[in-house]
Structure formats: C-alpha cells, structure tokens
Amino acid sequence: CIRDRAYVSQLPKTRHNGLGPGADLELGERLYEENCVDCHGAAGEGDVEKHIPAIAGQHYEYLMRQFENIRTGKRRNSDPEMVEQIQGFSPAQQAAVLDYTARLRPPEDKLAPYGWLNPDFPAYVRDAAGIRATPPAPPAQSE
C-alpha cells in the first residue's frame, strides 16, 4: 500500500483537473487560509516529511469524496487533527473550500506534459486533456 501511494504521488498531475461550480471562491479561500494552510501549505503543496499530501491540482469530486470519508471515519488512516478540524464544516463551506482547493495549481514541473496518457489506464480511458478516445470494439457475439 505504501509502495502504491509512493508510485501514485510521483505521477504527473493533470493540467485539466475537475473543478467545482465556482459559486463561492472567496469563502473557499478564506476557509482554506483559516483551516488548511498550516498543514497543506499556501499553494496546497503538502509536506512529504510529515506525510501531509499535496492537494493542489486534485479533482474537486475526489476532494469532496476524501473530505467526507475523513469526516465520517471511512478513511481509517486519517490524521486525527484533520478529522477534528473539519467536523464543523457545513455542506456549503465544504463545497466552497474544496472548489477553491481544486483550483490551486501545482508547480509546472509537477504537471503532465500536454497529451500525456497515464500508463496505468487503457488508451480509451480519459487522457490528461480530458479527451475520450474511441474504445475498442466489443467481441463479436456468437450465435
């Protein structure tokens, strides 16, 4: 599991991650500065030595899912400080802070080159630019 996380953390970040609705980014920024910046950093860079993940450039839906899993205890390896920190967030606050977070950009050297395809997914899966290639034809049905 640790080897898998180390591998995934070294993959380049997509240049076109999924964003939220953009409805309340000012609130999201304020909440991020008040609640997240001390651990995750001003640019969402995380802290490798403290095992705090980089969250810049993550997909909004992924962030929403992980936030909820951390809050409800489904993610059992969560930092107890974070679990406590996020308990009081309303759904609107959660959406705002994670929409803001999804818009934080990783450094250029962490971004995937244009046209990069994740080697772990077949060619027909959505690539880094969000383009869906044609999937292979299904096998012929025998009668």
Residue ranges and their predicted role:
Residues 3-47, 60, 65-72, 76-143:
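Flexible coil segments in periplasmic/lumen-exposed cytochrome c-class electron-transfer proteins
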Residues 48-54:
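Short cysteine/histidine-rich zinc-coordinating motifs and their immediately flanking basic loops
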